[in-house]
Amino acid sequence: MAEKRNIFLVGPMGAGKSTIGRQLAQQLGMEFFDSDSVIEERAGAEISWIFDIEGENGFRKREERIINELTQKQGIVLSTGGGVVLSKENRNHLSARGIVVYLQTTVAKQFERTQRDKKRPLLQGVEDARQVLENLAVIRNPLYEEVADITLPTDEQSAKVMANQIIDLIDNFHG
């Protein structure tokens, strides 16, 4: 890869964005950011607390500011939150400022990966988490597809294998 272009990872919760993003950044010698972690750092609070106090709208406003800021950096790998694509502004920034990789996963795999995770505000206190994930997929999957330059399924691969696949695809990407 001659010049280091930004790589932005999008996809649903449990797709492996953070794990794959760290691996990718390490292999490419690029700086890694996780937008949810940056939001928590700046707020001095966990995302679940932000959701409780400010609601999803308050969180999404914070997310827009952070996405705008981080996507202006050069040569980074950015793992985004699952709902990042709900904002047209975020989709525009991601599309214009880097290569967007959509990490696809099935609802079954998402459920398996997130069922014991207490840091998923949209899944807290719900009767049927699988149904919530299915509902989110109906709304968000078309938006991930809209913004993606590259789409990869993540269900059966390790983070290292996924990172290598992304590197190969980006080396051949001329968008």
Curated annotation (Swiss-Prot):
Q: How many and how are cofactors bound here?
A: Binds 1 Mg(2+) ion per subunit.
A cellular component term from Gene Ontology for this protein is:
cytosol
Q: Which SUPFAM superfamilies match?
A: P-loop containing nucleoside triphosphate hydrolases
Sites where the protein binds substrate: 36, 60, 82, 140
Q: Using the UniProt record, name the top-level EC class of this enzyme in a single word.
A: transferase
Offer one Pfam family short name for this entry: SKI
Give the record's pathway: Metabolic intermediate biosynthesis; chorismate biosynthesis; chorismate from D-erythrose 4-phosphate and phosphoenolpyruvate: step 5/7
**Positions contributing to Mg(2+) binding:** 18
Q: What is its EC number?
A: 2.7.1.71
Per its UniProt entry, which superkingdom is the organism in? Answer: Bacteria
Q: What does the record give under GO molecular function? A: ATP binding; magnesium ion binding; shikimate kinase activity
Specify whether Kinase is a keyword of the entry.
yes
Question: What keywords are annotated for this sequence in UniProt?
Answer: Amino-acid biosynthesis, Aromatic amino acid biosynthesis, ATP-binding, Cytoplasm, Kinase, Magnesium, Metal-binding, Nucleotide-binding, Transferase
Q: Which cofactor does it need?
A: Mg(2+)
Where ATP is bound, by residue?
14-19, 120, 157
Q: Which reaction does it catalyse?
A: shikimate + ATP = 3-phosphoshikimate + ADP + H(+)
> Subcellular localization, per the record?
Cytoplasm
Q: Which GO biological process entries does UniProt record here?
A: amino acid biosynthetic process; aromatic amino acid family biosynthetic process; chorismate biosynthetic process
Function according to Swiss-Prot or TrEMBL? Catalyzes the specific phosphorylation of the 3-hydroxyl group of shikimic acid using ATP as a cosubstrate.
Among PANTHER family, the record links this protein to: SHIKIMATE KINASE, SHIKIMATE KINASE 1, CHLOROPLASTIC
Subunit info here reads: Monomer.
Q: Which family is this protein grouped under?
A: Belongs to the shikimate kinase family.
The protein depicted here goes by the name: Shikimate kinase
**Organism (species):** Actinobacillus succinogenes (strain ATCC 55618 / DSM 22257 / CCUG 43843 / 130Z)
**Lineage summary:** Bacteria, Pseudomonadati, Pseudomonadota, Gammaproteobacteria, Pasteurellales
**Gene that encodes the chain:** aroK
